[in-house]
Design a protein with these regions (language model features):
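Core catalytic region of metal-dependent phosphoesterases/phosphodiesterases
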Residues: 3-5, 10-116
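Conserved beta-sheet core of the metallophosphoesterase superfamily
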Residues: 107-110, 114-139
Length: 139
């Protein structure tokens, strides 16, 4: 079975609801730490997916500043992985390339799509997977 997710943003503290009520941060994820958030994301994915399933990650796994950490976190995911790169993933790849880890990162995936989208067939449906908005002017 195929599953789809986007904007995981492993390790992004700015996404957490600020415990101090600081209005400058507009995080919406209800975790006390990025470690708790990362663990819950992994737990939820693994509770839903099996090793026979494919998880399409439609952009934004992490940020450039925690690119190395994303490798160890992705290794905990059970399903096969396909990455359609989003805007933050380009920085992740660049940071990993600078450290000689790009190949290690990409080896965790069945496919890495560096373009803007991927067209797949899932059952009777054709799906255009893209991290970016798509407008269909024909309808």
């Amino acid at each position: 079975m195929n599953y789809y997710i986007s904007d995981i943003h492993f390790g992004n503290e700015a996404l957490l609801i600020p415990p101090d009520g600081n209005e400058a941060r507009k995080g919406t994820r209800p975790f006390s730490s990025v470690e708790e958030m990362n663990e819950k994301i992994i737990e939820n994915i693994n509770d839903c997916c099996t090793a026979e399933d494919t998880l399409y990650i439609i952009g934004d796994i992490a940020q450039f500043y925690n690119a190395e950490e994303s490798i160890s976190l992705l290794k905990h995911l059970v399903p096969k992985l396909v990455l359609i790169m989003g805007n933050h993933d380009k920085g992740v790849i660049a940071a990993l390339k600078a450290k000689g880890l790009e190949v290690t990162f990409k080896s965790l995936f069945e496919r890495v799509i560096s373009g803007d989208s991927l067209l797949i067939r899932d059952g009777k449906y054709d799906l255009l997977l893209s991290h970016y908005p798509v407008v269909n002017l024909a309808t």
